[in-house]
Amino acid sequence: YGAWHDIEVDDDVTTFVEYENGATGVFITTTGDGKGTNRFEVQMDGAKLVVEDDKLTVTEFDVKESEFTKTNTEVFGSIKTHNLEIEIEKTNPQHIGVINAWAGKILHGTPLIAEGAEGLKGVILSNAMHLSDFLGREVEIPFDEDLYYEELMKRVATSKKKENVTATFADTNGTYGGAKV
């Protein structure tokens, strides 16, 4: 906490996740880099998807990875692949897009980007990441919410109040993928 800034919240996170079906994932985020990189990568048995720099790259494998692993005899052998690049929408409104969709749902009945239950899943995952860090061990979802609250309150109790703080308001236009606030 406060790895890169004088704050008491996480500003540098790396999380490893494992799902019931055996799938794994890595989530990395930081505020300690000069220019962030948004990258989403999904590795599957027969292909890989990468979303980065306003494009989706689909790398299809000529042979499934699971089959290749069993049959390959070359040292450092690699699967033959072919790529398909797909341009994606240049405007990525991120947070402001979610807020605008929420307002549109209230005002005009237009669809949400995701229902509230999906947002709750994100909060649960974030809280699990924090609890794992608080305890210094892996945690499973669902986790003990009372334990999470107890651990969180320990941190609240030792929080350092900053003296002589001045409120600052910033123009955040352009920070959400070019979307206007």
Regions found by a protein language model. Give the residues of each.
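C-terminal glycine/acidic-rich active-site capping loop/insertion
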Residues: 5-6, 14, 19, 44-117, ...
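Short, hydrophobic/amphipathic alpha-helical packing segments
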Residues: 99, 123-126
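Short arginine-rich
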Residues: 125-135
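Short secondary-structure junction motifs
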Residues: 37, 136-138
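Rossmann-like dinucleotide-binding domain that binds NAD(P)(H)
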Residues: 1-24, 29-35, 41, 117
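Generic detector of contiguous secondary-structure segments
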Residues: 36-39, 43-45, 126-127
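Loop/helix-junction capping segments adjacent to catalytic residues or to phosphate/diphosphate-binding pockets
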Residues: 36, 113, 123
